[in-house]
Amino acid sequence: MGFTDKQEALVRDSWEFMKQDIPQLSLRFFSLILEIAPVAKNMFSFLKDSDELPENNPKLRAHAVKVFKMTCESAIQLREKGEVVVGETTLKYLGSIHLQKRVADPHFEVVKEALLRTVKEATGNKWKDEMKEAWSEAYDQLASAIKAEMHAEAAA
């Protein structure tokens, strides 16, 4: 399924709204990942031996903002480019680091759930099934691009 004009508009409009609060939403996004899958904490070197709350961890804050922005911005470009657009070196790096950390399909699903919950909370009563479907499609395409790089890296 391609990314439709309507899906692009839904993602773009909600992203424009969410951009006003990226630091807070990014922390919420990562907090949800850790809430859904507490063992994910061990996948991040800056969280492994820490009992700090996510909002008190500057490395997590920086990482959360980077991941959240990249996820959302790649979704915005999906319709225009017809594919996930992340710099080639960035995509290769993402594939490599995800392979190194032994990220598997269930991990991608946790991140997807956290993303959808974050967008739902941020957009409030604007959240509808079609917005959920739009963000799901956008995320699935990003996850597929990362997985393809993981497979390429593993085969090399």
UniProtKB/Swiss-Prot annotation:
Quaternary organization: Homodimer.
Molecular functions (GO terms): heme binding; metal ion binding; oxidoreductase activity; oxygen binding
Motif (Homodimerization): 35-39, 105-117
Domain (Globin) ranges: 2-151
Alphabetized Pfam families for the sequence: Globin
Role description: Phytoglobin that reduces nitrite to nitric oxide (NO) under anoxic conditions (e.g. during flooding or in waterlogged soil). May not function as an oxygen storage or transport protein. Has an unusually high affinity for O(2) through an hexacoordinate heme iron because of a very low dissociation constant.
Cofactor: heme b
CC terms in the record's Gene Ontology section: cytoplasm; nucleus
Localization (cell): Cytoplasm; Nucleus
Entry similarity comment: Belongs to the plant globin family.
Gene: HB2
Chain sites annotated for binding heme b: 45, 59, 63, 98
Species assigned in the record: Solanum lycopersicum (Tomato)
PANTHER family, A to Z: LEGHEMOGLOBIN-RELATED, NON-SYMBIOTIC HEMOGLOBIN 2
Keywords: Cytoplasm, Heme, Iron, Metal-binding, Nucleus, Oxidoreductase
InterPro entries the UniProt entry points to: Globin, Globin-like_sf, Globin/Proto, Leghaemoglobin-like, Leghaemoglobin_Fe_BS
Reaction(s) catalysed (UniProt annotation): Fe(III)-heme b-[protein] + nitric oxide + H2O = Fe(II)-heme b-[protein] + nitrite + 2 H(+)
UniProt-recorded name of the protein: Anaerobic nitrite reductase HB2
Keyword Cell cycle recorded: no
Domain of life of the native organism: Eukaryota
Entry's cofactor comment: Binds 1 heme group per subunit.
